[in-house]
Each structure stands twice: as C-alpha cells, then as structure tokens.
C-alpha cells in the first residue's frame, strides 16, 4: 500500500476515534442536561408552592392583626 494512502487511512482512523469520543460526550451532556432540567423544574415548582404558602400565611397574619385592631 502506498505510504500516502496509509497516512490518509491513519488520519481517518484518528478522526473516527475522535468522532466517537465526541459522540459519547455529547450523549453524556444531553443526559446531564435532561437531569438538570428536571431538577430545575422540580425546584421551581417547589418554590412556587412555598411562595403560595408564605402568601397564605401572611394573609392569615394580616387578617388576625386587623381583627385585633378592631377589638
């Protein structure tokens, strides 16, 4: 086999190996992104519920304070 062809085949082999490493890393990053998005969504949902509960508690406090002022 011609030395130039060997060199080109060797280069193709290196590029294919790099391509596979990159593909594996992309799959890993996509998995991390899905997990991160899920975690973010769960935390955001929890904070929305916490905010609603705080608002309800503040409303209860304000109502009690208003009742006490009118006694």
Tell me the role of every PLM-derived stretch:
Residues 1-20, 45:
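Short, charge/polar-rich alpha-helical segments
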Residues 21, 27-69:
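Short, charge-rich amphipathic interface segments used for partner binding and complex assembly
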